[in-house]
A protein has these predicted regions:
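Flexible hinge/capping segments at coil-to-helix
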Residues: 1-37
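Generic preference for hydrophobic
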Residues: 3, 13-14, 37, 85, ...
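Short beta-strand-to-loop elements that line the ligand-binding cleft
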Residues: 59-69
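A late-sequence structural motif
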Residues: 22, 100-139
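Short secondary-structure boundary segments
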Residues: 17, 87-90, 111
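Short beta-strand-centered segments that line the small-molecule binding cleft or hinge
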Residues: 1-15, 73, 78-81, 97-100
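Secondary-structure junction motif
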Residues: 21-22, 36-57, 121-129, 138-139
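A ligand-binding cleft/hinge motif common to bilobed small-molecule-binding domains
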Residues: 49-52, 56, 70-98
Length: 139
């Protein structure tokens, strides 16, 4: 298997417009102390990265719901059931929601392109990998 780094995805906090924190443009992790969250299921990369950062900052949140998809998290947050967190590439603008920047530690997940090593040079796949290389994050 070949694994090629593709993109860093910054985590984004989001809230229903009716949530008191929705009026903020930026928050620190410390400001999330005691807040209710709707999170993805245990094992989710986004959740793992977020919970690790919370632990490092000694911040405790309350998990009101665990959902199996980003879409379910978005709908629960829109209904006012808690705050949500997703990768910026997965955040879908919604008039019921407000994205809020997080200050402090860099909270990222990483996307990779994975393929079978023996197929890496197949014409179609090689073309795709070349195109993806022009679109990946620098560095």
């Amino acid at each position: 298997i070949t694994c090629l780094p593709y993109r860093r995805q910054r985590l984004v906090l989001f809230a229903a417009l009716s949530h008191p924190l929705a009026q903020k443009s930026q928050l620190s992790l410390k400001q999330l102390e005691g807040q209710e969250f709707v999170l993805r299921e245990q094992g989710s990369t986004t959740r793992r990265v977020f919970e690790h950062a919370l632990k490092q900052a000694d911040v405790r949140i309350r998990v009101s719901l665990e959902m199996g998809s980003r879409e379910a998290v978005r709908e629960a947050v829109a209904q006012g059931l808690g705050l949500g967190i997703v990768a910026d590439t997965a955040y879908v603008a919604d008039p019921r929601l407000r994205a809020i920047g997080l200050t402090g530690p860099e909270l990222y997940t990483h996307a990779h392109i994975i393929c079978l090593k023996e197929r890496k040079n197949a014409r179609l796949l090689a073309h795709f990998l070349s195109l993806a290389d022009t679109m990946k994050d620098p560095g």
